[in-house]
């Protein structure tokens, strides 16, 4: 079909608008995030903005946030966690909306004594309510090398992956009354902070401040998502993550990780839910 000049121009405008709405950040910590707390404890480490560190001492932790908000997206980063005795520390990478009825999707790494594994804590909040925790002990030492952690959030599901391996899927079950984050745009956040009252063995192990400052590293930050601007998000479904689901191989890999490395699943906690586990668990 031959296009007129006017039709071609209109098509170009539509294409440019779609390209702006579905934005890919091949991540620069200089350009795409701001270190919003920590009083100098968060630092971009290289000229290209590919490596950032967050530190924690007895006075304060630190954190950064994305400049843009997104309504759906795929966010990933490589992290190397605090080595040695990290008891009482929490290192995070998560999505969150503002307000008192916020939505949130969490990767939280709970520190431990030397020689004991980190606990990877995942959770999903909708309208300020969470209580959907799954926890894992990783199959590697996350303090030795960088590993890739990814959150894929689309209208159908949320997928958590570690080094490309799915560890958790939280499906949209609004049809049976389970809230799902579909309406509130979120920013990407990362932080390193102290939570010795609960983070390690329920607060039994306290932070050894003689080991401070504690430092975690982030690199190769990347976000592909639907940018929220001027009260709306136009998001064409032309990117693989927007309709991503786990095929049979992905399901098998996820179940394998869960059977070997999952240490807590709210869906199995009958003591916590004596009247029956949440409906999405069945």
Swiss-Prot record:
Pfam families: Glyco_hydro_16, XET_C. Keywords: Apoplast, Cell wall, Cell wall biogenesis/degradation, Disulfide bond, Glycoprotein, Glycosidase, Hydrolase, Secreted, Signal, Transferase. Its EC number is 2.4.1.207. Residues 27-218 form the GH16 domain. Residues 1-26 form the signal peptide. It catalyses: breaks a beta-(1->4) bond in the backbone of a xyloglucan and transfers the xyloglucanyl segment on to O-4 of the non-reducing terminal glucose residue of an acceptor, which can be a xyloglucan or an oligosaccharide of xyloglucan. InterPro entries: Beta-glucanase/XTH, Beta_glucanase, ConA-like_dom_sf, GH16, GH16_AS, XET_C, XTH. It is found in: Secreted, Cell wall; Secreted, Extracellular space, Apoplast. Root specific. Xyloglucan binds at residues 108, 121-123, 131-133, 197-198, 202, 272. One of its GO terms (cellular component) is apoplast. The record marks 106 as: Important for catalytic activity. One of its GO terms (biological process) is cell wall biogenesis. Its main location: secreted. Disulfide bonds join 226-235, 267-281. The active site is at residues 104, 108. SUPFAM superfamilies: Concanavalin A-like lectins/glucanases. Contains at least one intrachain disulfide bond essential for its enzymatic activity. Gene3D superfamilies: 2.60.120.200. Glycans are attached at residues 112, 238. GO terms for molecular function: hydrolase activity, hydrolyzing O-glycosyl compounds; polysaccharide binding; xyloglucan:xyloglucosyl transferase activity. Catalyzes xyloglucan endohydrolysis (XEH) and/or endotransglycosylation (XET). Cleaves and religates xyloglucan polymers, an essential constituent of the primary cell wall, and thereby participates in cell wall construction of growing tissues. Belongs to the glycosyl hydrolase 16 family. XTH group 2 subfamily. This is Probable xyloglucan endotransglucosylase/hydrolase protein 18.
């Amino acid at each position: 079909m031959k296009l007129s000049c006017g039709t071609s121009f209109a098509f170009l405008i539509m294409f440019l608008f779609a390209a702006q709405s579905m934005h890919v950040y091949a991540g620069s910590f200089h350009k795409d995030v701001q270190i919003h707390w920590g009083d100098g404890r968060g630092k971009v480490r290289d000229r290209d903005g590919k490596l950032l560190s967050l530190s924690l001492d007895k006075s304060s932790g630190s954190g950064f946030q994305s400049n843009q908000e997104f309504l759906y997206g795929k966010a990933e980063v490589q992290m190397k966690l605090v080595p040695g005795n990290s008891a009482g520390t929490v290192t995070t990478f998560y999505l969150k909306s503002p307000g008192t009825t916020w939505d949130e999707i969490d990767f939280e790494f709970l520190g431990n004594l030397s020689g004991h594994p980190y606990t990877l804590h995942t959770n999903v909040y909708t309208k300020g309510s969470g209580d959907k925790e799954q926890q894992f002990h990783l199959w590697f030492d996350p303090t030795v090398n960088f590993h890739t952690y990814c959150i894929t959030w689309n209208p159908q599901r949320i997928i958590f992956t570690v080094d490309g391996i799915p560890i958790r899927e939280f499906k949209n079950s609004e049809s049976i009354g389970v809230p799902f984050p579909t309406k509130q745009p979120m920013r990407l956040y990362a932080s390193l902070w102290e939570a010795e009252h609960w983070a390690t063995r329920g607060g039994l192990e306290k932070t050894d401040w003689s080991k401070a400052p504690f430092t975690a590293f982030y690199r190769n930050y990347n976000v592909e998502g639907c940018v929220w601007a001027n009260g709306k998000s136009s998001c064409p479904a032309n990117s693989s993550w927007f309709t991503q689901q786990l095929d049979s191989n992905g399901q098998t890999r996820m179940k394998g990780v869960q059977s070997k490395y999952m240490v807590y699943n709210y869906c199995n906690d009958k003591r916590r839910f004596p009247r029956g586990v949440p409906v999405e668990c069945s």
